Each structure stands twice: as C-alpha cells, then as structure tokens.
Amino acid sequence: MELIEKHASFGGWQNVYRHYSASLKCEMNVGVYLPPKAAGEKLPVLYWLSGLTCNEQNFITKSGVQRYAAEHNIIVVAPDTSPRGSHVADADRYDLGQGAGFYLNATQAPWNEHYKMYDYIRNELPDLVMNHFPATAKKSISGHSMGGLGALVLALRNPDEYVSVSAFSPIVSPSQVPWGQQAFAAYLGENKEAWLDYHPVSLISQGQRVAEIMVDQGLSDDFYAEQLRTQNLEKICQEMNIKTLIRYHEGYDHSYYFVSSFIGEHIAYHANKLNMR
C-alpha cells in the first residue's frame, strides 16, 4: 500500500493509502486513521462506508471521527465508494456508476467487470488491513445512506465477522425505492429475487440476524420518506425480536452536519461492543 497523505490528528495519524485491488481491477484509495495507541499495540477496526457521490475523503475530512477514535483506541478504515478509473464503467448520473457502487457484486455487463464492492469490503480490504496495520481480528462496521445500506447488508449476511453494526440514514428497503431499484436493475438485472441479497429488511425477514442494530435518522432529511424508510427496519426488527437503538432527530438533515453531530456516540457504541468480545 502506497502512502499518499499523512496528517497528524489527535495524537494519531490520518493517512490515505493507494493500492491495486484484485477484486475491483483498479487502483483504490482508502483512508486509515491510526490512533496514538496504534504505535505500540494492536487495536480493533471500524469500517466506515460512505454514501452516494462520496469518496474516501468525505468522512475523514467532515465527520470529526479522529477525536473519538483516538479516545476509544479504534482504527478507522474509510474506503472509496466504487471502483475508479477511465477504464471503469460509469454513468452520467450521480446514483449509478463511479461514486455509487452500492457495496454489491454486480452480475450484469458492463458493471460486472469491476463492480465487486461486496467482495472488496468483506474480504480483500480486511486482509490488507490485517497485513499492513496493527489491527486485531475484531471489527465492526458503520456507514451513511448508501453506506448504511452496505453496512447493514454486510453485517446481516456475515454476523460472525462483525462485532457490531450501526448506520446513519440508511437505505433499508432498496428494492422498493428509486435509488435501489435503478441501481439494482443495472447492476443485478431484472430478476428481483437477486436484489433481496442486498435488501436489509428482506434479509431480516428471511432469518438473518445480528445482536443489535444502531441507527440515527434525521427527520428533516429530504430523502427520508422516499428513499430511506427507516421505519421499515424498525418494524421488521420488532417482528423478528432483534434489539435496536433507532433514534429520530428533529431538525437534522442528510448531510455531514448530521453525521458529525452523533459520530462520537457511534464510536463509543462500537468501542463498548468491541471491548466486550
């Protein structure tokens, strides 16, 4: 992994690395925050998945996560949201193609050549982190919007691999909303049964479980009713007896002003779970 940025932050280092991804067949950037204690011991890892139009920079420059990661001794890994490059398929829209990988494995041309974000996040990236950084095997996952969707899907499909999961403003019923329908049709084809592998509410209804789910949702979020539908997740978790910490916040929107307001509580939540295991 090639170090391309290094910034001192809260006694640790906010770095950005570039590496070639065998899963995605392109060069990828990834942000890694190493708290002060990483200089002398191995620490657990939180993977953060960003939302539509984002890259590895949005979370590390806007959320203020470094302060809390330093306090709780957690390495934070923030990858890009899709494969990148002039040779990678793209679309002339913000919600498909580069910047909109949806953390799935595409099966349809031209996307299936590079868009294997599920494999990248689940397998390739953790292997790189374990090999290059002072990381323990304990890991948790979180994300925002499209990234919240990805975090929920990865945790629900791999409950033994992630100690805990949380999300900000996640897309919980993607096959029922425009963002998900358009992306899934392109990446996965018209067989809607295949879509359910990346549909958190459906995964839970089929019996996939995690110990607990934490979600924060702003009630002034312009996408709440049409695209996110947090209440669907709350309802199915109640029906399936999955413990939740779902909080609705008056006045907060979909932006990083919202994420930065509550990221400290998410880091504390994950730190508590990681230290219990």
UniProtKB/Swiss-Prot annotation:
Gene3D superfamilies: alpha/beta hydrolase. Keywords: Hydrolase, Serine esterase. It catalyses: S-formylglutathione + H2O = formate + glutathione + H(+). The active site is at 145 (charge relay system), 221 (charge relay system), 254 (charge relay system). It comes from Escherichia coli O157:H7. One of its GO terms (cellular component) is cytosol. Disulfide bonds: none annotated. Signal peptide: none annotated. This is S-formylglutathione hydrolase FrmB. Belongs to the esterase D family. Its EC number is 3.1.2.12. Coiled coil: none annotated. It is an enzyme of class 3 (hydrolase). Serine hydrolase involved in the detoxification of formaldehyde. Hydrolyzes S-formylglutathione to glutathione and formate. GO terms for molecular function: carboxylic ester hydrolase activity; S-formylglutathione hydrolase activity. One of its GO terms (biological process) is formaldehyde catabolic process.
